[in-house]
């Protein structure tokens, strides 16, 4: 009885205490722009400044907190870049207090006096969205948002320039939540100036279909959403960047943008021949061979337009023109794991290329009422590409570097020895190590046109979530390609026992290949609420795909020596096959080769039926289901003198599960699983032997089975506001059953390969990562960030030698990566100590001598300083090292120093003169190594890494308000205000790699 009374008493006291809690609410607003201020700190203090409670304003500036009792209090509001605001409030009669809008003023005077009490937070988490504050990341003057993204915690930049955030590749860029240059992330990353960006949000965006239906179609994309600074999203802004560099380098950009309440228009222009290297200084340790694959010149014109009429009509449009010229030289050395003994190969190649492309995309979303949504997405692409290539390659049955320092030069002596018997045999030939030598050249050209369109209609049938969607997609494409290839091959171990020195053959061919394809589909979905926040979702989709390729091949391999020598004397040039064909002694049709010509026609009829269950709860979301995909394919194939007509009927199965749990508004757990079935290609299933290239023979396999891949991902994030501490971890796992691998039969006499696809089990990989970012002190002046990755790959493949029993080769690879940075920042200075580590442990079953236990690490400081008189300095020094390679030449040290110095001029510093220095010590290399189950490959490219560049940058703000003009005048940064935009102009004269290219 006493326990019951005590329990009731405690309950009554708790209820009384709760009843006495008074709620205080309000909205924090920027007085100059009337925009809400996000992430402001709101503190409730007693009259003697004793802390009681606190809160953080949300993205709408709203906050709420509780007062314990009636009385007089102080409400203190602080936010980075604003003056502290204190209000005296009185709580009476137990009533709540609604304060409405609370205006706060920008801290312009304090900034000029260089008085800052707290630094901007680097990252904040809101459910499954990462919000990065651009003011917390110092980038070099004039830089674009690519430089900003590289500095974000959890960001990874690959060798091809693609960017991953938290382990997922970024597929789309948004600006203020609106689509920007859809389908092209690099245009935004390399052209939007950092000076206009306020915050960056990283999250997974669902597809158009999933947004309106809730049905997960597996088309989720990772996006970066760049928010424009307050006051800069209205009016006209522009900037221009003109430059000149040593070694004929240039990198120019231009940008103009117009904003008002409904319209947003941006135009870009850029031209450079620096491989889009970006800006030196402040970047920290770099990678090996990153973005230095040859010499590349590019030009771009882009236009992006957004329109929004409240919630009724939204429109996004983009148009882009790209031109590129490439001049790429590569040297490759490979060890191929063919069996217990390796095969070695070396090659040198010279490639020239140029391309032009137009890409246009449009999106119209109309919401005529609260129950209806209509969306239309048309797009087109027009592209033309030219290429010239020349290469020399050789294969060896022993490590050639044990015999000679330059294997290709020595192998070329063997070819000359065939014509001049007075020359001695090459060292490789004397040792019996030279298997074959190939020299080849080619000219190719292609032009393509593609049209696509999507129309989607969604209707909500009730407020409970019942809805129906109808969608249709259609596409049409055509490609016309021409290519001329000339190959001379020498095989040195064939018939040696019979006294022959070598076997030699030529392959001269001209191909004309038109391709046509089109497709259409019709989709219907229905979502039924079973009970509160629980939905059953059904969908059906029919797709028809058609494609036809009709390649005509003309064979000149039976040329006489006189004809072959005549062709060898012609200098290749773009689309210059007429220079060769014009010398033919017979009409072109007489060289038509029906066996080498190829015709194929596909007709695919695909049905997709999906059933999903979806549960929405305050703490978690759960959806699971499966898709069944019956498919019928009709295939007609004419090749190698065979005519084949076949039909295949298969059924694919794809289960899916997505679970999200919310621990709090800043802490989430997500588990995702998707299984997919994939079928072997129709050509792989045909019992045909393609020996058109005697050194690369391909066979089909009618017995191939479909493969099934399991993909699993676990993701967790958390944020501790008090310590400005963010952490993220993820685990990815993928395993494929009956994956398709090429079984390679190696002929040690010719160096040729016969490949045939086979099913194999054992391919799987796992990757995990952990990101931790925290302020060390309460003001956020000191910060540390670490990003750790661990990956394991089990790669399998088939190998056999001279037709003997095939062997299963396994390469087990463990990779550990670490990127750590510790930094100090104040109003005018940021100093970072950066370090990276990559450890690679690999074990090869058939080739123990090819095992790897290597280290790549780099470390060094980066500094960014801004002076009161408008001068800015950015520099980084990085020592990059390799260790553990059996080839001692790979164990190198590279000390790379980059720097940039700029000075602002005129009132408000709209004019900036800047000088940049890349690789001041001339030590950066372009050598890289790759390892698979089949081979180890070392590649080195030509590049220009060390040069200097002078920039003159001017920025303009015509219509924007006072705050926008101030922000533009001072470069958009909250400190000594000197960062300009980044832009450009087209170069004067043709860039290297362009024009009428000849060898």
Annotate each language-model stretch with its function.
Residues 45-50, 72-88:
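A short, solvent-exposed loop/turn motif at the edges and junctions
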Residues 32-46, 125:
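Short, ordered, surface-exposed loop/turn motifs in non-cytosolic proteins
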Residues 22-30, 61, 100-102:
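A short, amphipathic beta-strand motif
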Residues 280, 289-295, 328-336, 343-355, ...:
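Extracellular/periplasm-exposed beta-strand and loop segments of Gram-negative cell-envelope proteins
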Residues 20, 60-62, 76, 82-83, ...:
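Membrane-proximal, glycine/serine-rich, low-complexity loop/turn segments characteristic
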Residues 37-38, 64-72:
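Short Pro-Gly-centered beta-turn/loop motif in secreted/extracellular proteins
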Residues 320, 359-367, 371-383, 431-636, ...:
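Face-selective signature of the C-terminal outer-membrane beta-barrel domain
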Residues 47-62:
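Short, acidic Ser/Thr/Gly-rich low-complexity loop/linker segments typical of extracellular
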């Amino acid at each position: 009885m006493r326990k019951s009374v005590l329990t009731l008493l405690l309950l009554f006291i708790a209820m009384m205490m709760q009843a006495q809690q008074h709620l205080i609410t309000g909205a924090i607003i920027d007085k100059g722009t009337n925009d809400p201020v996000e992430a402001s700190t709101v503190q409730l203090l007693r009259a003697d400044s004793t802390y009681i409670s606190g809160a953080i304003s949300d993205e709408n500036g709203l906050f709420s907190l509780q007062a314990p009792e009636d009385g007089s209090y102080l409400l203190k509001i602080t936010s980075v870049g604003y003056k502290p605001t204190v209000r005296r409030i009185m709580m009476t009669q137990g009533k709540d207090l609604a304060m409405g809008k609370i205006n706060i003023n920008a801290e312009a005077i304090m900034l000029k006096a260089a008085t800052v009490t707290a630094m901007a937070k680097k990252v904040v988490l809101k459910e499954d969205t990462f919000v990065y504050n651009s003011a917390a990341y110092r980038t070099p003057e004039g830089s674009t948002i690519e430089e900003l993204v590289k500095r974000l915690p959890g960001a990874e930049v690959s060798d091809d320039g693609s960017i991953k955030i938290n382990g997922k590749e970024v597929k789309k860029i948004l600006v203020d939540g609106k689509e920007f240059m859809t389908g092209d992330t690099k245009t935004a990353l390399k052209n939007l100036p950092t000076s206009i960006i306020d915050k960056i949000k990283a999250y997974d965006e669902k597809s158009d279909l999933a947004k309106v239906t809730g049905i997960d179609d597996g088309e989720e994309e990772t996006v970066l959403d760049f928010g424009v600074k307050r006051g800069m999203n209205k009016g006209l802004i522009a900037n221009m960047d003109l430059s000149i560099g040593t070694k004929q380098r240039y990198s120019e950009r231009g940008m103009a943008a117009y904003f008002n309440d409904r319209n947003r228009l941006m135009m870009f222009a850029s031209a450079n021949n620096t491989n889009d290297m970006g800006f030196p200084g402040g970047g920290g340790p770099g990678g090996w061979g990153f973005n230095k694959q040859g010499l590349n010149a590019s030009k771009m014109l882009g236009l992006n337009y957004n329109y929004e009429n409240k919630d009724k009509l939204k429109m996004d449009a983009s148009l882009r023109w790209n031109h590129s010229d490439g001049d790429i030289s590569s040297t490759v050395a490979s060890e191929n794991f063919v069996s217990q003994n390796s095969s070695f190969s070396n090659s040198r190649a010279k490639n020239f290329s140029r391309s032009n492309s137009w890409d246009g995309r449009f999106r119209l979303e109309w919401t005529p009422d609260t129950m209806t949504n209509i969306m239309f997405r048309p797009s087109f692409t027009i592209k033309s590409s030219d290429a010239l290539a020349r290469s020399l390659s050789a294969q060896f049955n022993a490590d050639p570097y044990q015999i000679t320092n330059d294997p290709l030069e020595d192998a070329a002596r063997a070819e000359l020895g065939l014509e001049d018997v007075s020359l001695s045999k090459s060292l490789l030939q004397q040792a019996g190590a030279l298997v074959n030598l190939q020299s080849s050249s080619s000219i190719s050209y292609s032009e393509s046109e593609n049209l696509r369109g999507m129309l989607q209609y969604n209707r909500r049938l009730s407020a409970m979530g019942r809805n129906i969607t109808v969608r249709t997609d259609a596409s049409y494409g055509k490609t016309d390609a021409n290519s001329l290839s000339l190959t001379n091959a020498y095989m040195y171990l064939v018939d040696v026992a019979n006294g022959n020195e070598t076997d030699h053959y030529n392959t001269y061919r001209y191909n004309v290949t038109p391709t046509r394809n089109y497709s259409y589909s019709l989709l219907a979905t229905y979502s039924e609420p079973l009970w509160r926040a629980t939905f059953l979702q059904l969908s059906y989709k029919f797709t028809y795909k058609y494609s036809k390729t009709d390649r005509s091949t003309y064979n000149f391999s039976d040329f006489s020596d006189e004809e072959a020598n005549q062709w060898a004397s012609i200098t290749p040039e773009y689309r210059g096959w007429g220079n060769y064909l014009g010398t033919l002694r017979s009409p072109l049709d007489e060289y038509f080769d029906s066996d080498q010509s190829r015709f194929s026609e596909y007709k695919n009829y695909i049905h997709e039926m999906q059933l999903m269950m979806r549960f929405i709860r305050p703490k978690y979301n759960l959806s699971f289901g499966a898709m069944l995909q019956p498919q019928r394919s009709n295939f007609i194939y004419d090749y190698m003198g065979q005519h084949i007509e076949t039909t295949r009927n298969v059924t694919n199965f794809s289960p899916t599960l997505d679970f999200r749990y919310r621990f709090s508004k800043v802490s989430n757990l997500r588990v995702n699983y998707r299984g997919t079935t994939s079928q072997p290609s129709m050509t792989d299933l045909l019992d045909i032997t393609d020996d058109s290239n005697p050194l690369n023979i391909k066979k089909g396999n009618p017995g191939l089975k479909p493969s099934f891949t399991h993909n699993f991902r676990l993701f967790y994030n958390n944020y501790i506001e008090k310590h400005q501490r963010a952490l993220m971890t993820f685990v990815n796992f993928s395993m494929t059953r009956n994956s398709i691998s090429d079984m390679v039969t190696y002929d040690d006499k010719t160096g040729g390969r016969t490949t045939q696809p086979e099913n194999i089990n054992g391919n799987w990989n796992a990757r995990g990562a952990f990101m931790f970012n925290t302020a060390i002190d309460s003001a956020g002046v000191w910060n540390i960030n670490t990003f750790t990755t661990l990956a394991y790959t089990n790669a399998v493949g088939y190998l056999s030698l001279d037709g003997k029993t095939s062997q299963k080769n396994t390469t087990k690879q463990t990779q550990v990566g670490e990127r750590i940075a510790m930094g100090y920042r104040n109003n005018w200075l940021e100093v970072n100590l950066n370090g990276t580590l990559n450890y690679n442990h690999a074990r090869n079953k058939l080739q123990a001598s090819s095992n790897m236990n290597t280290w790549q690490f780099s470390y060094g400081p980066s500094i960014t300083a801004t002076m009161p008189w408008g001068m800015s300095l950015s520099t980084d020094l990085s020592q990059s090292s390799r260790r553990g390679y059996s080839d001692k030449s790979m164990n190198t040290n590279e000390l790379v120093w980059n720097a940039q110095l700029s000075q602002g001029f005129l009132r408000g510093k709209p004019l900036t003169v800047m000088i940049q220095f890349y690789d001041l010590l001339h030590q950066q290399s372009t050598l890289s190594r790759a390892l698979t189950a089949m081979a180890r490959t070392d590649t080195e490219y030509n590049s220009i890494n060390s040069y200097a560049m002078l920039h003159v940058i001017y920025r303009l703000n015509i219509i924007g308000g006072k705050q926008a003009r101030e922000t533009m005048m001072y470069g958009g940064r909250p400190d000594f205000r000197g960062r300009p935009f980044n832009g450009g102009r087209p170069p004067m004269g043709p860039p290297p790699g362009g024009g009428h290219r000849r060898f």
